[in-house]
């Protein structure tokens, strides 16, 4: 059954987030040969439309307004619903991001649509789109179908591979005007944090800690190195269970799946559940006192040593490189 599917693209720090392309790929599956329409909301987003098309969208609709320069649920909901009424899609796809998790339930309620959140895989079987998502804190997975109304899903980042980019691919780009008003929230200032504020799913560099960090205080040298490298801090399930850090930092089968350019694993043994969340990193560096630790089997570079001795040395060397670069 061919469907029209509307995909929310997300722009952050002057570029489209990778999850936007993953959402387009998911939408292609849901569409079953139907049309995939990208949607971009913001103050100046039209320049990103072609990139969505290069990754598989058939056409893109943009809504630009200074009132959409920063995300608010009221403003984005107003703009989205105007586009929805014009397009009448049978499917909607968001990334399972802070924006997607906040906005999609509100829209699903307004549209009386069944929302399947945190989707890690999807397929078409027996005429239905079958969504796979984790349950019970990732201890199990369930498969769900939506039998009536609009198919509405949020896609967990780094789980569904984007389509290959085709810069020769063409599609129509149109704009709509929406009178965004009655906003209950006004963004006065955006304050950028250091390592803790970097989105793990988008980070190019991740410094991750396991039980070997020994305490909440033990994460301090990881954060210092992450700040120097402009990266994010992550953690294994073991470190989270031990209450060394928040579960929002968890990487692995039951946490976030990441694919950074550089992944430095500190005091992480390398349980298969953790490897499932980071083994596709471009370069993996392991630091562990145990030379037999499983993490070394997937590492490109290994350092057998005490992370509390190694990390300060790495931090100082990277600081020197930054000064001379």
What positions do the PLM features span?
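N-terminal glycine-rich FAD/FM-binding segment characteristic of electron-transfer flavoproteins
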Residues: 1-325
